[in-house]
């Protein structure tokens, strides 16, 4: 069995985690600003991209109804050797209606055994979970039935709670544990994880985990909600974070793929926020105790992002396909009928120091309409790794005069002056791609600065129509640019450099090449 767990990752393919369960695990609709999330909805943000989460959990389903409605058949037909199936039922098996009810120790256990055995027959790896706790700080005889109610929070309906969390699941918690022991299956005690969390937070603070929504603040539940079963975004993210650590312990083969980020941005509702700017706003000002990590899940985020000076030490990490884009350009009119200007056209502005970005695409999609900046970097000690900068004229604006920037294995494309500005910047092992004739760089290095632009081990490439490209022209008289051990494509003119029509610039600039090919 242990060998099976680890062999799942020997093949060069993505491993899928299939999830089956009820509403506490399920993905939720996002209409009306719905704040409800199952913990499975957000689980993908805690794994690297070697792991794909496919959540089939459904609201209101028990182990019985999940089988009877054909939902299990859909899942098991998709399972391939080495895939995982996460199994969590209980809340609705407790219901009295015959379409859902099962008995612990008999029919409930039998259904769990079926899930396990059929998963193994397909070469998959089952993992059993018991039910998350209900937030029940009172002797509530209707706690089980209230799962389905999602009660409005109207006057006089607020529950009176005690101080001790009271169990509502009974023997249904033991069935997954017993079947796991019987069949040698990994078991995650989610009830204990969530019970300890809710009890530790207490009756008032624990409401922050569940769907306790004031009246009139959410279009999805305009009358508010008093719900002690279903999780909100914060609750789902908190509980998934605790659970994934337990998963790593019980299923060691998954441990290397577990990731924790302070915030997650996702278009599909699987994160804390839908936009990158919301995540930036959430970062504490001048946080000095450590870096704030933000995962941007796959998706196209059309927005203008500003990272102000107070949001220091942010790490912005993208999944493959995480694209930040906008289409402003210098001559475009703003709301006052004025031209936006080159600086005003940028998709992203970085003013804070110690910014780090990895695997993010910064794009200005305006096209060939003149100056249109994808990324404007002013903060000191900015580090970009494996990022892409897409645009045409003025793609990357290295703006800060005292800013030091490092571009590591990045891709930067454009036409005219598509890397430009005052900053000191090192480009290492980057691909610099020309989309047409023009100039790769236009530095405006201040007089007295020791360095301007340094390119080391970079590859300069171009489209077929790019035939006449200069390495640089000086935006200011003391411009500096050096290319070392770079691969200069045939599109680079032998003369290399352009003086921007000013012969006197040749007396003050510092342009150099060393051992390029």
Residue ranges of model-derived segments:
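N-terminal module-boundary/linker segments of secreted carbohydrate-active enzymes
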Residues: 13-26, 30-31, 258-272, 282
């Amino acid at each position: 069995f242990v060998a099976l767990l680890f062999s799942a990752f020997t093949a060069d393919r993505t491993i899928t985690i299939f999830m089956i369960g009820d509403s506490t695990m399920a993905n939720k609709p996002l209409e009306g600003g719905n704040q409800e999330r199952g913990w499975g909805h957000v689980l993908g943000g805690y794994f690297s991209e070697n792991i794909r989460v496919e959540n089939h959990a459904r609201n209101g389903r028990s182990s019985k109804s999940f089988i009877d409605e054909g939902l299990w058949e859909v899942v098991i037909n998709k399972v391939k050797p080495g895939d995982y199936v996460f199994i969590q039922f209980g809340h609705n098996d407790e219901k009295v209606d015959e379409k859902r009810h099962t008995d612990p120790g008999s029919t409930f256990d039998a259904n769990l055994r079926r899930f396990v055995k059929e998963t193994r027959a397909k070469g998959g790896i089952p993992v059993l979970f018991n039910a998350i706790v209900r937030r029940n700080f009172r002797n509530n005889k209707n706690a089980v039935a209230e799962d389905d109610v999602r009660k409005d929070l109207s006057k006089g309906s607020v529950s009176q709670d005690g101080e001790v969390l009271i169990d509502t699941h009974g023997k249904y918690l033991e069935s997954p544990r017993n079947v796991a022991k019987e069949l040698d299956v990994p078991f995650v005690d989610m009830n204990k994880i969530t019970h300890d969390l809710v009890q530790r937070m207490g009756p008032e603070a624990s409401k922050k985990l569940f769907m306790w929504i004031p009246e009139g603040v959410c279009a999805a539940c305009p009358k508010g909600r008093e719900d002690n079963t279903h999780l909100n975004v914060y609750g789902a993210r908190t509980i998934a974070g605790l659970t994934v650590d337990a998963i790593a312990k019980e299923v060691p083969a998954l441990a290397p793929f577990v990731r924790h980020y302070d915030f997650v941005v996702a278009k599909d509702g699987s994160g804390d926020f839908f936009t990158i700017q919301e995540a930036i706003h959430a970062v504490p000002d001048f946080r000095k105790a450590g870096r704030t990590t933000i995962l941007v899940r796959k998706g196209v985020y059309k927005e203008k992002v500003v990272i102000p000076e107070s949001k220091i030490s942010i790490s912005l990490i993208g999944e493959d396909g995480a694209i930040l884009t906008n289409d402003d350009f210098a001559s475009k009119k703003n709301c006052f009928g004025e031209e936006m200007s080159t600086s005003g056209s940028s998709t992203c502005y970085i003013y804070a120091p110690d910014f780090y970005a990895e695997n993010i695409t910064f794009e200005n999609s305006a096209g060939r309409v003149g100056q249109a900046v994808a990324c404007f970097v002013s903060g000191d000690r900015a580090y970009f790794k494996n990022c892409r900068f897409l645009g045409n004229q003025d793609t990357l604006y290295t703006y800060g005069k005292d800013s030091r920037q490092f571009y590591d294995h990045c891709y930067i494309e454009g036409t005219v002056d598509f890397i430009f500005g005052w900053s000191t910047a090192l480009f290492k092992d980057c691909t610099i791609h020309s989309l047409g004739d023009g100039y790769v760089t236009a530095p405006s290095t201040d007089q007295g600065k020791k360095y301007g632009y340094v390119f080391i081990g970079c590859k300069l490439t171009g489209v077929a129509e790019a035939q006449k490209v200069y390495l640089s022209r000086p935006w200011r008289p003391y411009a500096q640019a050096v290319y070392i051990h770079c691969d200069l494509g045939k599109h680079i003119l032998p003369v290399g450099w352009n003086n921007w029509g000013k012969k006197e610039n040749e007396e003050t600039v510092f342009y150099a090449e060393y051992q390029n090919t």
